[in-house]
Amino acid sequence: MHNESPIKRRKSTRIYVGNVPIGDGAPIAVQSMTNTRTTDVEATVRQIQSLERVGVDIVRVSVPTMDAAEAFKLIKQRVNVPLVADIHFDYRIAMKVAEYGVDCLRINPGNIGSEERIRQVVDSARHHNIPIRIGVNGGSLEKDIQEKYGEPTPEALVESAMRHVDILDRLNFDQFKVSVKASDVFLAVGSYRLLAQKIDQPLHLGITEAGGARSGSVKSAIGLGMLLAEGIGDTLRISLAADPVEEVKVGFDILKSLRIRSRGINFIACPTCSRQEFDVIGTVNALEQRLEDIITPMDVSIIGCVVNGPGEAEVSTLGVAGAKTKSGFYEDGVRKKERFDNDNIIDQLEAKIRAKAAMLDEITV
């Protein structure tokens, strides 16, 4: 029930990663990356399928060897989501996975090699109608750029990116997106801002090596939030030293918070105090776990007392405002006669949410 996002997105060109449109106003795609051994086909397929279940749009898979390329071929046949092959050092691996149906090639300008090698990769990508991501990383810049700037700077990252953008331009290849990632928030943000002024291609956002689940989520939310609020970004990945499933959840939460893209329930819940009339924290935790399968966008407010409860409920799809023994229930901003028993509030609210989701899904069909 909240208003649409006020963010005006940067105009960019359109490419496709598999069947997923990127850029030119398409929904910002949420990406993750497997952390299994790619040669372990079963483990990698299982992880990709777990990412599919939480709504991932694109999955990147590291392909460090020719053996991994052979495994990638088998993996691609068993999953539905578009796959990006992450290529470093050996350009021949990129050409091999292109034959095997990869949906996008990620190459690192800092280690992929000479312009002639890039030309061969581009020729292969063109032949197989595959886009490329130029993936610059502050930790692996070309040696001459490192020597020129002394340390990673926005100008250094963007110079690395533009060097390879120019190569693709000379080769008349425009099916690409670019990333300029860094582990430092301000370095990454500055790099993306500078790059956004120079090219029209889609930008893939990320704070690389952000950290564990908590610290990495915070870093990513700050850095990507700054850029997204300025309209910069067409795809994103939250890089966490954690289960990749968490990357997808955090990515969607960031987009929901900025009202850029909604998937599933946006829970609005108070931090609780002595005024709470039911167990708010337990209720929210239980519902988040129970309702992970709901992809229908909706706002659900769960407030433990009548101070802010009614006000939040009035601007939510569904809402509960705590009261003695039985709490008030709101739907589409209107208070209902029905009240929830505080001792059974989780089950009652789950039933209401599922029913509302089903109704909204019917309306949008």
UniProtKB/Swiss-Prot annotation:
Alphabetized UniProt keyword annotations: 4Fe-4S, Iron, Iron-sulfur, Isoprene biosynthesis, Metal-binding, Oxidoreductase
Keyword Plastid: no
Entry superkingdom: Bacteria
Enzyme Commission code: 1.17.7.3
Record's cofactor remark: Binds 1 [4Fe-4S] cluster.
Known role: Converts 2C-methyl-D-erythritol 2,4-cyclodiphosphate (ME-2,4cPP) into 1-hydroxy-2-methyl-2-(E)-butenyl 4-diphosphate. Involved in density-dependent regulation of 2'-N-acetyltransferase.
NCBIfam families linked: ispG_gcpE, PRK00366.1
Protein name: 4-hydroxy-3-methylbut-2-en-1-yl diphosphate synthase (flavodoxin)
